[in-house]
């Protein structure tokens, strides 16, 4: 096609494009900056981050998943890494900080190879081979454990909580005991010896007041609500529970309407009709044999009165997530309309009771039809402490779920990373060619984990790494960093520091895939932000300043 001499506009005005090595290096830098931010939070001696949102709310935590969720990341490559970390948290509930740190290290090593004019495709191929070999080696190094033994679960939970707010003292022991009891309750054994654990059966309810030592495990569901009417029973045994997703109120017309009453008798008949409709609703509920009503919507005051007269305990405006948990626990079917109500839709529990917890009242549903439903009722001095304790408990629950799903462990404290690095360097020599350089770089990146752990313990990181390499070359495959005592151990499993193999494999896989995804990008096309609407009284210069292209800062 002949050129016409006129400019050809492909992209919308204001669109910013970066391509080639410049785009790749910018993406690598963004990911490395994010990894550098999280690095100091890794391990038992990891430091906390204080996160302040746009409303001034403060979160203090060293939990990697919480940090990446709360941070407002702007650069697209860093956002990609954040999404990988979130996926790691959703998949196994642990190892989010490790994923980001390892991905950052892999990209740092890749950048050095790019400086040596190694093509990104070769680096990607080398990293892919290294990842596959690393996953095979982790399985090879893993040691089976007897998960029927509570002491094994306790040590896994201790390792998970070592870097957390509740990592020491009687509070830790209390939480670990509750978590083990909860997991044992909801776990179902598979024919292959592993377990299936549905954590949806474990509810965490927080109530300010008291201390963490006042927390307890309830075998049932706890609702942060109170009985709606003072005349209703506060305790119902052999409860037949109606779970509603519908209001016990007279429905208002969807259209705006006005009713003009010219006669007082007509007003009375109108009110009587409303009362009759509400009475009929309650009669229909009572006819099924229900003696407890739990609804997501509201309950009219007149309906409350009739329910109380029937001796029915009622709770209103319960969260959707709690409604689903109650239905699952009691075997009830969520009813969306009273027209569909049948006795077989009711759930069952041995006891529904309102109890005072601190200064508030809560409703306890115990002895549910499904015995696998439990609630961890957390107590604490303030909301910040309770939020962090909740995050810690979720981490411990996921850690135990992972070891039950695949009952194998590897040494903690960076032991498995050093072992993998040693074996991958040997593997690289068998591959040869330029891919050998990429596999060796991958191996060096793995050593970032023990290096960071050693730094957090106040040790000389280089000296610690050299000693670990020496021990692993002598056959000590679980030699690692004892962060709490600031020394190198020949076998981390002997001091009860180990990790579920499922988590370790997912960390390697997620970090590798994140790094490879970023290395595949050679063109970044960012659309211009939408221009603000022109405001009256603005000068032309001010209007001009509102436009412009995209800009990424990190």
From Swiss-Prot:
Residues 530-554 are annotated as: Disordered. The keyword Transmembrane does not apply. PROSITE patterns: TCP1_1, TCP1_2, TCP1_3. Molecular chaperone; binds unfolded polypeptides in vitro, and has a weak ATPase activity. PANTHER family: CHAPERONIN (PTHR11353). Forms a Heterooligomeric complex of two stacked eight-membered rings. This is Thermosome subunit alpha. It comes from Aeropyrum pernix (strain ATCC 700893 / DSM 11879 / JCM 9820 / NBRC 100138 / K1).
């Amino acid at each position: 096609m002949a050129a016409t001499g006129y400019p050809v506009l492909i992209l919308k005005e204001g669109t910013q494009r970066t391509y080639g090595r410049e785009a790749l290096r910018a993406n690598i830098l963004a990911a490395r900056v994010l990894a550098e931010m999280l690095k100091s939070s890794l391990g038992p001696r990891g430091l906390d981050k204080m996160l302040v949102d746009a409303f001034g709310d403060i979160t203090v935590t060293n939990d990697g998943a919480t940090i990446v969720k709360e941070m407002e990341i702007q650069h697209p490559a860093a956002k990609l890494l954040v999404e990988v970390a979130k996926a790691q948290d959703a998949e196994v509930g642990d190892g989010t900080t490790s994923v980001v740190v390892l991905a950052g290290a892999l990209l740092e090593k890749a950048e050095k190879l790019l400086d040596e004019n190694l093509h990104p495709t070769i680096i990607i191929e080398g990293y892919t081979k290294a990842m596959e070999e690393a996953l095979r080696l982790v399985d090879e190094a893993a040691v089976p454990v007897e998960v029927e033994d509570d002491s094994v679960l306790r040590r896994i939970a201790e390792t998970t909580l070592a870097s957390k707010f509740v990592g020491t003292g009687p509070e830790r022991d209390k939480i670990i005991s509750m978590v083990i009891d909860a997991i044992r309750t909801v776990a179902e054994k598979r024919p292959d010896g592993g377990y299936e654990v549905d954590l949806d059966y474990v509810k965490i309810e927080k109530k300010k007041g008291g201390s963490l030592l006042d927390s307890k495990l309830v075998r049932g569901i706890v609702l942060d609500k109170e009985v709606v009417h003072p005349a209703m029973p506060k305790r119902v045994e052999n409860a037949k529970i109606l779970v509603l997703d519908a209001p016990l109120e007279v429905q208002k017309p969807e259209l705006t309407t006005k009713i003009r009453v010219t006669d007082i008798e007509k007003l009375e008949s109108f009110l009587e009709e409303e009362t009759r409709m509400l009475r009929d609703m309650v009669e229909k509920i009572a006819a099924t044999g229900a003696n407890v009503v739990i609804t997501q919507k509201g309950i009219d005051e007149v309906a409350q009165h009739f329910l109380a007269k029937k001796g029915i305990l009622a709770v209103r405006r319960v969260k959707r997530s709690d409604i689903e948990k109650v239905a699952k626990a009691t075997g009830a079917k969520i009813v969306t309309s009273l027209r569909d109500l049948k006795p077989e839709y009711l759930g069952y529990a041995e006891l529904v009771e309102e109890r005072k917890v601190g200064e508030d009242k809560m409703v306890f549903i115990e002895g549910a039809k499904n015995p696998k439903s439990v609630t961890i009722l957390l107590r604490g001095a303030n909301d910040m402490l309770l939020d962090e304790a909740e995050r810690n408990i979720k981490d411990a629950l996921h850690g135990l779920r992972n070891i039950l799903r695949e009952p194998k462990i590897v040494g903690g404290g960076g032991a498995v990373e050093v072992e993998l690095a040693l074996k991958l360097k040997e593997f690289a020599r068998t591959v040869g060619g330029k891919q050998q350089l990429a596999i060796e770089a991958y191996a060096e990146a793995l050593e970032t984990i023990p290096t960071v752990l050693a730094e957090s313990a106040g040790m000389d990181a280089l000296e610690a790494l050299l000693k670990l390499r020496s021990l692993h070359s002598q056959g000590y495959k679980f030699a690692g960093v004892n962060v709490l005592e600031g020394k190198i151990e020949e076998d981390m499993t002997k001091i009860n520091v180990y990790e579920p193999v499922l988590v370790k494999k997912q960390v390697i896989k997620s970090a590798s895939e994140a790094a490879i995804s970023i290395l595949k990008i050679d063109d970044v096309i960012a659309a211009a932000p939408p221009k603000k609407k022109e405001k009256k009284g603005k000068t032309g210069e001010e209007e001009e300043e509102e436009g412009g292209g995209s800009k990424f800062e990190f």
